[in-house]
């Protein structure tokens, strides 16, 4: 949606790191794609400069932007909710599951930082959108949204609620690619989706 706002004719090519034997970098090089949104942050097992949104010119990485999580703000709000009694839980027999917390930019728990590759004029535009999201004046998941089959998934005067966003199993009509099948995933990815309950697994 962000890409379409800048260029309505642009296409987003999606590849999944969790698929077995998937050489994403080679595919993007073959297609001439050099603007990439990669993993959100550096991980201990895979230290790399390729994270966040960046331009990859023949192996030279130029960072544009990346998300950041302020865990101090998150835990502060979590503890405050417990002390105030607003923290809730659902019990199912001997199982206890905490409710989801929809804390975004307006809470201070999530933000965005800019890389050296993002010019000052573009930063002004991103800042404008960022402040609009924080104030609730701009909702990214609003307006008419169509899936790859051309079906309307959200009407022009509607906004997807958080549950609908997190449960999205479809891709926008400007996206090239697909959601992988369970059997296409690597063993680590299969374990992740089963533990997180991201998809229903039929044995």
Q: Residue locations for each model-derived region?
A:
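A residue-level marker of the well-folded mature domains of exported/periplasmic proteins
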Residues: 1-203
């Amino acid at each position: 949606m962000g890409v379409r706002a800048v260029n309505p004719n642009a296409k987003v090519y999606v590849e999944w790191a969790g698929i077995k034997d998937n050489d994403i970098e080679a595919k993007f090089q073959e297609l001439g794609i050099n603007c990439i949104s990669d993993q959100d942050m550096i991980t201990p097992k895979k230290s790399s400069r390729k994270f966040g949104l960046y331009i990859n010119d023949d192996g030279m990485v130029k960072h544009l932007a990346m998300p950041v999580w302020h865990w101090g703000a998150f835990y502060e709000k979590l503890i405050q909710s417990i002390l105030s009694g607003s923290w809730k839980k659902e019990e199912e027999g001997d199982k206890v599951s905490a409710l989801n917390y929809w804390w975004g930019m307006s809470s201070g728990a999530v933000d965005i930082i800019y890389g050296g590759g993002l010019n000052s004029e573009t930063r002004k535009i991103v800042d404008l959108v960022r402040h609009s999201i924080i104030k609730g004046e701009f909702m990214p998941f609003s307006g008419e949204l169509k899936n790859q089959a051309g079906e309307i998934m959200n009407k022009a005067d509607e906004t997807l609620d958080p549950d609908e966003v997190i449960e999205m199993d479809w891709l926008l009509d400007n996206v090239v690619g697909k959601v992988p099948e369970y059997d296409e995933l690597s063993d680590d990815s299969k374990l992740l989706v089963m533990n997180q309950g991201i998809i229903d697994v039929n044995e």
